[in-house]
């Protein structure tokens, strides 16, 4: 990216040079990159190409499990996370049969900058950053909601040099990856899930004002300037106009459904608060929410047993702050259990301790 604008925040066809001056994708003679393999050309570094290549590789394989970076403290990792969300928002609208298990993980906190604890009996993932002494976890990722996998035996050897991950790290000629192995190799692997079964993605959404398209684009946050404000999620927010007395959202589903849950994401700006929302269903059922989570994380609204409906109306009855609004609405009839997927690793069966708990009580 350039020093002034990240590729993710650039206009679609603008060519953005990398730090080392490259303006096109590249690989090696033996291992050409995706664009060369698929199209026979190197792709210019533009936002449009970046997005289209990510979409093309997903469409080529339609993986049932998709693993990507999360809200990492690295601008390129964050850009990838946001772009994958953007692409998935389109794919989930275009193909009603595609509901992958989406798992996101941080690469720095707890991994690249994790504790050097390979030889510790408590060698499990903690979201600590040894480089700056923080234990940052993004508010959208609740530590107690993490999904943990147990690593196979070849990834937990008594000697580091026999570990298959260490052997793989030794193959890299840059980044000194092998020197970081004692930090990023753990007995568990930790991810956060983004469900993909929401009925909202193909729903018609109308609002009394503001940009309704933000409410079902799969992006629960967005950033207008990754380089200069990486942790400022100030974009992609439905904000009703100040003169809007209704502050209303009407969701019309493709077909009637027995709604079980509604997930709402509030504008993460700490000065913007939604105190209460009135939700009216097409079958006559009405519920009122309390305050939404103010950190931008999902607020889960449990819906009582009721008849099928295809209409959901939400009215912001009490708000605080001129930019109070929502980044996403998810409506669920069902969410597939993670055990129903063909998982590559066994789930961690121990009850995970809360972040910051007593390490001596861990199962290792």
Tell what function each PLM region has.
Residues 286-304:
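Extracellular carbohydrate recognition and processing domains
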């Amino acid at each position: 990216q350039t020093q002034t604008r990240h590729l993710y925040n650039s206009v679609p066809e603008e060519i953005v040079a990398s730090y080392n001056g490259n303006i096109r994708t590249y690989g090696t003679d033996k291992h050409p990159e995706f664009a060369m393999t698929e199209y026979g050309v190197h792709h210019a570094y533009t936002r449009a190409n970046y997005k289209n290549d990510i979409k093309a590789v997903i469409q080529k394989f339609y993986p049932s499990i998709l693993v990507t970076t999360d809200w990492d403290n690295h601008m390129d990792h964050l850009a990838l996370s946001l772009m994958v969300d953007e692409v998935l928002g389109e794919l989930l609208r275009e193909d009603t049969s595609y509901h992958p298990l989406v798992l996101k993980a941080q690469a720095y906190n707890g991994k690249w900058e994790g504790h050097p604890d390979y030889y510790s009996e408590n060698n499990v993932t903690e979201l600590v950053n040894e480089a700056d002494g923080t234990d940052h976890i993004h508010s959208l990722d609740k530590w107690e909601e993490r999904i943990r996998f147990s690593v196979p035996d070849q990834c937990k050897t008594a000697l580091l040099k026999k570990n298959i991950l260490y052997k793989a790290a030794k193959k890299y000629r840059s980044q000194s990856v092998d020197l970081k192995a004692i930090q990023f190799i753990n007995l568990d692997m930790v991810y956060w899930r983004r469900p993909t079964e929401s009925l909202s993605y193909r729903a018609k959404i109308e609002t009394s004002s503001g940009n309704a398209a933000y409410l079902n684009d799969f992006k629960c946050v967005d950033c207008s300037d990754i380089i200069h404000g990486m942790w400022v999620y100030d974009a992609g927010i439905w904000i009703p106009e100040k003169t809007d007395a209704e502050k209303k959202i009407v969701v019309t589903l493709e077909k009637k459904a027995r709604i079980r849950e509604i997930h709402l994401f509030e504008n993460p700006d700490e000065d913007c608060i939604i105190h209460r929302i009135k939700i009216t269903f097409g079958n006559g059922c009405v519920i009122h929410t309390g305050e939404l989570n103010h950190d931008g994380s999902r607020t889960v609204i449990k819906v009582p047993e009721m008849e099928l409906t295809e209409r959901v109306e939400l009215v912001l009855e009490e708000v605080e702050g001129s930019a109070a609004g929502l980044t996403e609405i998810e409506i669920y009839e069902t969410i597939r259990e993670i055990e129903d997927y063909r998982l590559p690793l066994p789930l961690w069966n121990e009850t995970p301790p809360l972040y910051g708990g007593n390490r001596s009580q861990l199962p290792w």
